[in-house]
Amino acid sequence: MAGRNFLFVPGPTNVPDRVLRAMVVSMEDHRSPKFPALTNEMMPGLKKVFRTEHGTPFIFPSSGTGCWEAAVTNTLSPGDRVLAARFGQFSHLWIEMCTRLGLDVQIVDCEWGTGVPLQQYADILKADTGHKIKAVLACHNETATGVTSDIAGVREALDEAKHPALLFVD
C-alpha cells in the first residue's frame, strides 16, 4: 500500500484495503433465516465478554424496542407500577411503550440531556415502603441527547432503600 501509512489513532486514518472490501459485503438481516446460525457462533465469545461460565447471553433479532417489550411483558403485568425518568427520546419511547402495555408508569420528568435523577429515584424508592413499584427503568446511554446515566447509582438507591424492584437498563 504505497503512500498509505496506517496510524492507529482516533482518526482520521487510512483504512486497509481488506477492511474496505469487507465493508462492501451486504449485511445479514437480523430477521433472516441465516441469522440464528451466525449468532450461535458468537455465544462462547459473549460468555467471555460478560465474564460468565453459567449465564446464558440472549441475542434478540430485533431493534432495542423489541428487547424492551420482551423484558417488560415477560416480567411485569398490566397494572404494575414502574418508575421511569423522561430525559431524552429513548426514555420517552420506553415510557410510552410501558403505558401502552398497561403499566402504571410513575414518571419523573427531567430536563432532556440530564440523565437519571438519582436523588429523586432514591427519595421515591425510600418513600415506597409498601413496595408498589415493581420495576425501575433507566436508560444508560440516552443516544438522542448523548447523556450517560449512573446505573451503579440507581442500583445503590434500590439497595439503600432495601427495595425489591427489578432494575431494567437500556
Predicted regions and their residues:
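Conserved N-terminal alpha-helix of the aminotransferase class I/II PLP-enzyme fold
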Residues: M23-A70, Q89, L93-T99
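General beta-strand structural signal in soluble alpha/beta enzymes
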Residues: L7-V9, F58-P61, A84, I107-V108, ...
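N-terminal "arm"/small-domain region of PLP-dependent enzymes with the aminotransferase-like
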Residues: M1-P33
